[in-house]
């Protein structure tokens, strides 16, 4: 981020900035005037919501931003997971985007990587046959993975 960025928050909303969790008590607009890593509360997913391959990847990447102390472990998990994930999808658009996401993470553009992963959810839903929210439904199995 090279320009300033204004973000409006609602009462009791949280924002994660460089690993700090900030909650506002009233409607506010904050202006980020330098390079920061941030994530809005509405974009945070919990572990139990990581129910598809791309949501699992999203969860791993979000840890890099929310928990800087655990970022190295999350990066290692990302590096191990990404090749398996690419191998598990036949959709060329998803695979190409995952390679771009790898570049973003490598360049420490975590917010952009999260945004790119979110944009793939509709493609993933189609690749999964529209059953990504059905517990126990078949999922792509990574090459070399075991049940």
Swiss-Prot record:
One of its GO terms (biological process) is negative regulation of bacterial-type flagellum assembly. One of its GO terms (molecular function) is mRNA 5'-UTR binding. It holds the Pfam family FlbT. It comes from the Bacteria. InterPro entries: Flagellum_FlbT. Keywords: Bacterial flagellum biogenesis, Repressor, RNA-binding. Has a post-transcriptional repressor function in flagellum biogenesis. Associates with the 5'-UTR of fljK mRNA and promotes its degradation. Belongs to the FlbT family. This is Probable flagellum biosynthesis repressor protein FlbT.
